[in-house]
Amino acid sequence: GDEHQNFAGELRRWDGGGDPVAVEFVATSISSGGSGQDKRANADRIMARNPELKFSNDQRGYLVCDVAPDLWQTHFRVVDKVHEPGGQLSTRATLSVERGKAAIVS
């Protein structure tokens, strides 16, 4: 897909039952048109209707993943603007997955 958003979520079986089977991190692009915003207008409604989603963000940026034997950490790096020079880079969220668990723990 072509979402131009940041997402993190837990994936479940097709029927939606049981424990999560995997974790997915989705990154936006850093240079697509429009600077985005922290949340889209309907983000709260989308999150409420999709409890498997643990994070959503509409800013431009990229992911940095720190992978160690017992922990995977994903840092959502975002810029406050891309439509003109001088955008400030920051870490919007850091989410982790522990070894042997298919769930986001932080």
Regions found by a protein language model. Give the residues of each.
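Long, structured stretches of catalytic cores involved in phosphate-ester chemistry, encompassing
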Residues: 1-106
